[in-house]
């Protein structure tokens, strides 16, 4: 059974470890001195590991930026699908009108509806791409 004295952390120990806790992981790994120096044993504490999870390094930010661009590019592919859909709708309108010219008004109404739905999906994909780029 541990005593209360063993569980308490002294203020001197906290002050000596604060510098190591604030530095990001990449900075502490890259700036290691070649000669061994006296460091307190608190640097391998679980508190330090928990604190370093919130630090971001340059590599982590670069990975996040690359992921943003990849996600935005994937979302932009839907705009090409919208263009293909619009072409299909109006191509079908021309074929339908050539087969039965008396249905001109009804075919045109359906073509406009198909155009609107296809364009809405393209704009939705573009909106998602902009949200990925600028809102995250």
UniProtKB/Swiss-Prot annotation:
InterPro entries: ATP_synth_F0_csu, ATP_synth_F0_csu_DDCD_BS, ATP_synth_F0_csu_sf, ATPase_proteolipid_c-like_dom, F/V-ATP_Csub_sf
Transmembrane segments: 77-97, 112-132
Catalytic activity from the UniProt record: H(+)(in) = H(+)(out)
Misc remark: There are three genes which encode the mitochondrial ATP synthase proteolipid and they specify precursors with different import sequences. They are expressed in a tissue-specific manner.
Subcellular location: Mitochondrion membrane
This protein's record includes keyword Transport: yes
Main location: mitochondrion
Single GO cellular component term: proton-transporting ATP synthase complex
Post-translational modification: Trimethylated by ATPSCKMT at Lys-104. Methylation is required for proper incorporation of the C subunit into the ATP synthase complex and mitochondrial respiration.
Modification N6,N6,N6-trimethyllysine occurs at: 104
PROSITE patterns: ATPASE_C (PS00605)
Keywords: CF(0), Hydrogen ion transport, Ion transport, Lipid-binding, Membrane, Methylation, Mitochondrion, Transit peptide, Transmembrane, Transmembrane helix, Transport
Bilayer topology annotation: Multi-pass membrane protein
Site (Reversibly protonated during proton transport): 119
Function in brief: Subunit c, of the mitochondrial membrane ATP synthase complex (F(1)F(0) ATP synthase or Complex V) that produces ATP from ADP in the presence of a proton gradient across the membrane which is generated by electron transport complexes of the respiratory chain. ATP synthase complex consist of a soluble F(1) head domain - the catalytic core - and a membrane F(1) domain - the membrane proton channel. These two domains are linked by a central stalk rotating inside the F(1) region and a stationary peripheral stalk.
Any GO MF annotation of the entry: lipid binding
Protein name: ATP synthase F(0) complex subunit C1, mitochondrial
Subunit organization: Homooctamer; the c-ring consists of eight c subunits forming a circle, and each subunit adopts a hairpin shape. Component of the ATP synthase complex composed at least of ATP5F1A/subunit alpha, ATP5F1B/subunit beta, ATP5MC1/subunit c (homooctomer), MT-ATP6/subunit a, MT-ATP8/subunit 8, ATP5ME/subunit e, ATP5MF/subunit f, ATP5MG/subunit g, ATP5MK/subunit k, ATP5MJ/subunit j, ATP5F1C/subunit gamma, ATP5F1D/subunit delta, ATP5F1E/subunit epsilon, ATP5PF/subunit F6, ATP5PB/subunit b, ATP5PD/subunit d, ATP5PO/subunit OSCP.
Protein's organism: Rattus norvegicus (Rat)
Top-level taxon of the source organism: Eukaryota
Keyword Kinase in record: no
UniProt record, GO biological process: cellular response to L-glutamate; cold acclimation; negative regulation of mitochondrial membrane potential; negative regulation of reactive oxygen species biosynthetic process; pore complex assembly; positive regulation of axon extension; proton motive force-driven ATP synthesis; proton transmembrane transport
């Amino acid at each position: 059974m541990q005593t209360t004295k063993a569980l308490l952390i002294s203020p001197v120990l906290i002050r000596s470890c604060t510098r190591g806790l604030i530095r990001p992981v990449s900075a502490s790994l890259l700036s290691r001195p070649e000669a061994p120096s006296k460091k307190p044993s608190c640097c391998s504490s679980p508190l330090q590991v928990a604190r370093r999870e919130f630090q971001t390094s340059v590599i982590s930010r670069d990975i996040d930026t690359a992921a943003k661009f990849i996600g935005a590019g994937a979302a932009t592919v839907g705009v090409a699908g919208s263009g293909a859909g619009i072409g299909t709708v109006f191509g079908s309108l021309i074929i339908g009108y050539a087969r039965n010219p008396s249905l001109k008004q009804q075919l045109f109404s359906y073509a406009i509806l198909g155009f609107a739905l296809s364009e809405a999906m393209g704009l939705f994909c573009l909106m998602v791409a902009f949200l990925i780029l600028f809102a995250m």
